[in-house]
Amino acid sequence: MKIAFYDAKPYDRVWFDEYVIEYGYKIKYIESRLSLETTILAKGYDAVCVFVNDTVDKDVIDELSEMGVKVVLLRCAGFNNVDFESSYKKLHVMRVPAYSPFAVAEYACALLLSVNRKTHRAYARTRDYNFNINGLAGMDLHGKTAGVIGTGKIGRIMIDILHGFGMKVLAYDLFPAKDADFEYVTLDEIWKQSDIISLHCPLTLETTHIVNEDAFEKMKNEAILINTSRGALIDTAALIEAVKNRKIGGVGLDVYEEEDDYFFEDRSNDILADESLVRLMSFPNVLVTSHQAFFTKEAMQAIARTTLDNLQRFERGDFLLNEICYQCEDKGSCDREKSQVNCF
């Protein structure tokens, strides 16, 4: 089978080329993102492989379907860039539901430590031989309260890490776990009680801007907010106002609400048009990185292997374990898992 691989980066080739020979598939790497204008590059291919910033809307789906493409392979866990109602009975859409939850949770912790102890600022100083530590004081995590929103695999691992620091952990999830060794509370209690808040939930209608002006008003002024999940979980305008008015102590972002035109690209010689992103990056207590929480060797190996396995299942006519359709719930599954029958 032939795969048109969109938004390809050099590191994608490293791991996909390592495994694709085993499957006997052909991959055409395309640097451009998938859009209506670039669908023509998939003509003659059985599948397209896409990432978080590729466009898989109705127009793109209709065009791909007419060209004979049968499968959309998401090499990521998130799927909010796909119009599932339009793809139903036209294209099978499969994702990588979990590649390395440890990678993301560990990175969230790294952001937390950097924002709290200001190691990124210390590094910048010492590079210029400035060994002054004024303004670099942080706080002990031990004994503090952490609020974790989203208790799937990543959230649960993050909770284990926070427990390791000796923190009390409060959690919120629309689908609470039954075997929790931590306390579930309301969102209001998360905002009011937490010294640290870490986001680990998917982006849905219910969670879009879950962190908003009202939430910031309820937070402690010294609280630290970490987001390694999806940018639109946070209302960017409200975040900027909260930082400007010292309503929050620090912020670590690996995702951004309008990241599509910037993240994963080299814009070092450009003048950024996104004033909100520029404003956020100007704050001394805000640390922004470019959606790299997933990026470990183990995660990339798992992404490549699972993506190719997904296509192999389709080729063989097997049950598509990682398929998503418009009937699936927010967590990316539906009753088909019980019956072992594909979405269509």
Annotate each language-model stretch with its function.
Residues 42-47, 67-69, 192-197, 220-223:
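Short acidic/histidine-rich motifs immediately flanking catalytic phosphotransfer sites
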Residues 222, 232-344:
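Rossmann-like dinucleotide-binding domain for NAD(H)/NADP(H)
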Residues 134-221, 341-344:
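Rossmann-like dinucleotide/phosphate-binding beta-alpha-beta segment
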Residues 52-53, 195, 201-203, 229-230, ...:
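Short glycine-/small-residue-rich Rossmann-like dinucleotide-binding loops
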Residues 66-71, 89-91, 167, 221-223, ...:
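A short helix->loop->beta-strand "cap" motif at the edges of active sites that frequently abuts
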Residues 89-145, 157-160, 164, 326:
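Phosphate-binding beta-alpha-beta segment of Rossmann-like dinucleotide-binding domains, i.e.
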Residues 2-94, 212:
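An N-terminal-biased, well-structured beta-alpha scaffold segment characteristic
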Residues 226:
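Glycine-rich nucleotide-phosphate-binding loops and adjacent flexible coil segments
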